[in-house]
A protein has these predicted regions:
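A recurrent flexible, glycine/aromatic-enriched loop bordering the glycosyltransferase active site
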Residues: 38, 44-45, 52-75
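Short, conserved alpha-helix that lines the donor NDP-sugar binding/gating region
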Residues: 1-2, 97-98
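Catalytic beta-strand/loop signature of glycosyltransferases that borders the donor
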Residues: 41, 107-115
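The conserved acidic donor/metal-binding loop of glycosyltransferases
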Residues: 13-17
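Nucleotide-sugar-dependent glycosyltransferase catalytic core
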Residues: 105, 118-145
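Short aromatic/hydrophobic "clamp" motif used to bind/position activated sugar donors
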Residues: 9
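Conserved donor NDP-sugar-binding/catalytic core segment of glycosyltransferases
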Residues: 21-52
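Acidic donor-binding loop at a coil-to-helix junction in glycosyltransferase catalytic cores
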Residues: 90-96, 105
Length: 153
């Protein structure tokens, strides 16, 4: 982050899908909220094992809170100047958000669009070893079409 330039910093994950309007979409909440960090909690998820797309946490959009998904972090440069990401192999995203909240920064969950959380069926592929029960709780099954057809606007 020290080498970055500009007023905002975004965190991406190379195994998830980001739509062509993702960055513009994530910048919008900074115009109508007083959030310091934005991201997505309500997300589209492609579950490879079931070959279906789901909407996760459908009620968790357009609201302040204490959690957004790590691969969707988008924050003001000032945040990274005052709160450092811990050097951990697991839990760095959650701890970063906790540290930001403790420092007085506000977190805002945006809409689910322009991002797809890709959940592979290969064991050990993901840092978070979640069960299917954990992944599919609080979801709405959408269908087996290409996940981009639901998510990208």
């Amino acid at each position: 982050m020290e080498l970055s330039k500009g007023n905002f910093i975004a965190k991406f994950d190379d195994d998830d899908l980001y739509g062509p309007n993702y960055i513009a979409d994530q910048l919008l909440p900074f115009e109508y909220t007083d959030a310091d960090i934005v991201g997505k909690l309500c997300t589209f998820m492609y579950h490879e094992k079931s070959a279906k797309t789901y909407l996760r946490f459908p009620k968790n959009r357009h609201k302040y809170g204490d959690l957004v998904l790590g691969p969707t972090f988008f924050f003001k440069r000032e945040v990274s100047e005052n709160v450092k990401m811990r050097d951990l192999s697991k839990g760095e995203d959650t701890n970063f958000l906790k540290d930001c909240l403790n420092a007085g920064y506000k977190i805002y969950a945006t809409d689910p669009y322009n991002f797809v959380y890709m959940r592979k069926k290969v064991e050990g592929f993901h840092t978070w070893d979640a069960t299917d029960e954990q992944l599919l709780s609080n979801t709405i099954a959408l269908g087996s079409e290409n996940p981009e057809s639901y998510a990208f606007v």
